[in-house]
Amino acid sequence: MKKYYDAVIVGCGVAGCFAALHLPQEADILMITKADTEDSDSFLAQGGICVLKNESDYDAFYEDTMHAGHYENTPESVDIMIRSSRNVINQLIAWGVDFRRDENGELCYTKEGAHSTNRILFHDDVTGKEITSKLLAQVKKLPNVTLLAHTEMCDILSGKNGCEGVLIRDEEGKLVPVYARDVIWACGGIGGIYDNSTNFPHIAGDGLGIAMKHQVVLEHLDYIQIHPTTLYSSKPGRRFLISESVRGEGAVLLNEKGERFTDELQPRDVVAAAIFNEMEKENSNHVWLSLAPIDEAVIQNHFPNIYEHCLEEGYDVTKEPIPVVPAQHYFMGG
């Protein structure tokens, strides 16, 4: 490892990899990650990625996004996200990402909460793993990128020009200052500070702590997304996500009486609040998710990861409902 790079990227999930792949190939880049390269939140994402299918869907897509964000979204950012989505998908496909296609080779679209139509591309129920692994493979081909696992950012190096690099702890535990013209943080998760989260435990908001120390302006630190459906367990550790696309394909939420109590495809904060309310009314530590409306072949074909994990936990989702509970999922401030 050298003492100076053109750019240091902290994190190697989708954001970090995408940054590395778009920087000039003559730039000397160091990427670091706190654990294994595959242990990013991006790797854990299940459901899929939304895309503008055609121009006629723009207005609905825009309104769905603004509504889900309680109209606090920056309109220009929403427009950029939607307008650029097809180009991003095309880039991902060019890098080898394999989205589900039908028998005619056309891309398949599923539905998730807060979307008024099917506009979600997916790879079974391990879309994050598919995207991140393919991006990582592309990054590892770049001769100008040095990727170091088990290497932790402990602080930034500040000087007269602002941020001038990072102080890292290497795999041997040594503190090493590394200087760079540009420092890119792609390490936004905070789930490790929660008892119940879908995130890896080591993802604990390190960047936020360092930002606060150096009086970096932060905003919306209370914008913490609670995912409505994780598999209930009394065991400690990371919570297993039950993808929203399961509800998009027809699964329903039930209370202890076997009654539906909410519209399952509302925005996540609304559905999570409805579940918490039902749990409080029934003095229960979970509600139930029934996949009975979904054909068994669809479950095993579209959701093989969820199907197998639930079997390991003693639940056959093709024959019985499963206990689910909300847990921390995304962090949208910073």
Model-found features: residue ranges?
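Residue-level detector of alpha-helix initiation sites
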Residues: 9, 13-14, 36, 126, ...
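Flavin (primarily FAD) binding-site architecture
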Residues: 185-198
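Short beta-strand to alpha-helix junction loop
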Residues: 75-86, 119-137, 148, 198-205, ...
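An anion/pyrophosphate-binding glycine-rich loop and adjacent beta-alpha core
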Residues: 37, 210, 216-330
